[in-house]
């Protein structure tokens, strides 16, 4: 009799236990960079604060180093809801929404601050609306930083020095076309495969911010650091719309609040660490040089003409007002 009553009590309790378990939403936050990079440091801070302030309703866990896949794989996972959150560079979004390419056009911004203002203003709102239609919710502007060219052959001073150089780019049409305009031989490759490709000599060169060059140990396979600053790289904390729409409104607001807060913190980390990364890269043996920036800016003007029609009058108008 006691056993039957106990079993009956367990069966009655089961729906309540199931509902209690379902009350916690697990959010895996994936990215491709190393644990020492500012993306990951800020992501861990974001996760801790979300978990604490949601009182256990949300459980964010960070997966660095491409553990859940490369950028495109993770973004496709966001669309289907099989991955809940990610941090990606702006260029990763171009293959899902071509107009997002405006963010990392060559020499698009006079300063980081100008880019922040534009992407936290009407231009950023328009781009966020476009990717929301692709199943991705933008929770905050983060940063990759200024990108520079490294290579194993020679210093790059003029665009002519890139002629014939095999350079890896992200899987991004804009970046490929930029380096074609500069005379290089670009080819896209997923970030997770880049170190071994450089090590094997499949590429002569690559381009990334100082923080990524250092934390990914590219100084082991590259000799020259030419400060081209050809692209300011944005980054974004994204959530799967399928998952986000199932979260209660107060917790959605919390994710947005903390996504923006930790984005600001991460951007400060990038700014504060650039000089230190440059010093450490020099200590590792990399040879730095400045470039003829006006010559590079002139050489990429055809890329702007090529993409004007891709971005369309609305996005180009918002961009021009942002930089006026």
Regions flagged by a language model, labelled:
Residues 2, 9-14, 24-114, 122-125, ...:
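N-terminal secretory/targeting leader peptides
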Residues 3-4, 18:
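Short, intrinsically disordered low-complexity segments
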Residues 19-23:
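Sec/Tat signal peptide C-region and signal peptidase I cleavage site
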């Amino acid at each position: 009799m006691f056993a039957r009553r106990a079993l009956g009590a367990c069966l009655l309790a089961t729906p309540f236990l199931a509902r209690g378990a379902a009350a916690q939403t697990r959010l895996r936050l994936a990215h491709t960079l190393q644990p020492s990079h500012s993306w990951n440091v800020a992501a861990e801070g974001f996760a801790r604060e979300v978990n604490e302030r949601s009182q256990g309703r949300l459980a964010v866990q960070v997966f660095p180093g491409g553990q859940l896949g490369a950028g495109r794989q993770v973004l496709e996972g966001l669309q289907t809801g099989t991955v809940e959150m990610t941090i990606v560079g702006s260029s990763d979004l171009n293959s899902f929404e071509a107009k997002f390419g405006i963010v990392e056009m060559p020499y698009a911004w006079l300063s980081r601050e100008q880019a922040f203002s534009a992407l936290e203003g009407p231009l950023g709102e328009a781009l966020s609306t476009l990717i929301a239609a692709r199943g991705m919710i933008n929770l905050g502007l983060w940063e990759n930083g200024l990108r520079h060219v490294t290579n194993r052959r020679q210093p790059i001073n003029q665009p002519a020095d890139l002629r014939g150089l095999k350079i890896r780019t992200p899987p991004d049409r804009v970046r490929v076309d930029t380096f074609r305009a500069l005379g290089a031989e670009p080819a896209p490759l997923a970030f997770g495969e880049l170190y071994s490709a450089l090590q094997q000599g499949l590429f002569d060169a690559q381009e990334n911010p100082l923080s990524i060059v250092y934390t990914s140990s590219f100084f082991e396979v590259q000799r020259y650091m030419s400060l081209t600053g050809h692209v300011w790289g944005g980054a974004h904390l994204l959530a799967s719309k399928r998952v986000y729409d199932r979260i209660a409104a107060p917790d959605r607001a919390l994710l947005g609040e903390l996504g923006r807060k930790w984005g600001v913190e991460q951007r400060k980390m990038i700014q504060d660490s650039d000089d230190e990364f440059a010093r450490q890269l020099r200590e590792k043996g990399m040879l730095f040089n400045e470039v003829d920036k006006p010559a590079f800016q002139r050489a990429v003007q055809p890329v702007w003409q090529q993409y004007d029609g891709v971005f369309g009058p609305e996005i180009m108008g918002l961009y021009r007002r942002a930089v006026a």
